[in-house]
C-alpha cells in the first residue's frame, strides 16, 4: 500500500484498509514514500510524483527474498499515480505484480496543483505547503548545506515550492 501526498504508512486510511485486508487473510505491507513517516534522515532526496522506481524495487525484493509471487499494489492519490506509473514502466517485467488498485489517483499532477491554487482550495494548499516546508526543515537538519532554507519564507504556493 502506498500513501498519498504528505501522508505516511500510519495515515488513518492506510491503517483502516490494511486492517481490513489483514482480517481477510492477506499479508499487508504499508510503504512510506521517501522522507515520509519519519524517514527524512535516510536519504538527501525529496520525494516527488515521478519516483516510481522505489515501488518496483520493493515488489522485486518481495519476490526474490520472500518468495511472494502474487502481489497486488494499492495506492491513494499521489501513491495511486505512482503505482500506475510504475505498472506502465515495468509492464510485464515484474511477473509477481498481479494487479493494482489506484484510489483517487492524481493522473495529471500539474492540473491538481492548478486546482489547489484556486481560492476555494486555499486551506488544502496551505496544509500541504506547511507540511512540505516543515519536511525541508527536518531534512536540512540531517543534511546541512543541502537546502537553502532562506527560500522557504518566499514560497507561498506549491508551484513556487516545486520551482525552487
Where would I find each of the regions flagged by the language model?
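Glycine-rich, phosphate-binding/catalytic loops in enzymes
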Residues: 16-19, 46, 90, 117-119
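Conserved alpha/beta-hydrolase
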Residues: 7-10, 18-42
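Catalytic nucleophile-loop/oxyanion-hole region of alpha/beta-hydrolase
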Residues: 20, 34-72
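The conserved beta1-alpha1 loop
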Residues: 2-4
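Short, hydrophobic alpha-helix immediately C-terminal to the catalytic nucleophile
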Residues: 15, 19, 56, 84-88
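Alpha/beta-hydrolase-fold enzymes
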Residues: 66-164
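Alpha-helix N-cap/helix-initiation motif
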Residues: 6, 10, 44-48, 98
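Short coil/turn segments at secondary-structure boundaries
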Residues: 12-14, 41-44, 114-115
Amino acid at each position: 500500500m502506498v500513501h498519498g501526498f504528505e501522508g505516511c504508512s500510519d495515515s488513518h486510511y492506510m491503517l483502516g484498509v490494511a486492517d481490513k485486508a489483514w482480517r481477510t487473510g492477506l499479508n499487508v505491507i504499508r510503504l512510506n514514500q521517501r522522507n515520509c513517516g519519519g524517514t527524512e534522515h535516510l536519504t538527501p532526496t525529496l520525494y516527488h510524483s515521478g519516483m516510481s522506481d522505489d515501488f518496483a524495487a520493493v515488489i522485486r525484493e518481495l519476490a526474490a527474498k520472500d518468495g511472494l509471487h502474487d502481489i497486488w499494489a494499492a495506492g491513494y492519490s499521489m501513491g495511486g499515480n505512482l503505482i500506475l506509473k510504475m505498472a506502465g514502466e515495468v509492464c510485464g517485467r515484474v511477473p509477481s505484480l498481479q494487479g493494482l488498485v489506484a484510489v483517487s489517483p492524481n493522473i495529471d499532477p500539474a492540473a491538481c496543483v492548478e486546482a489547489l491554487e484556486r481560492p476555494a482550495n486555499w486551506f488544502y494548499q496551505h496544509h500541504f505547503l506547511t507540511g512540505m516546508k516543515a519536511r525541508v526543515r527536518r531534512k536540512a537538519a540531517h543534511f546541512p548545506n543541502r537546502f537553502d532554507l532562506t527560500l522557504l519564507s518566499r514560497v507561498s504556493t506549491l508551484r513556487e515550492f516545486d520551482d525552487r
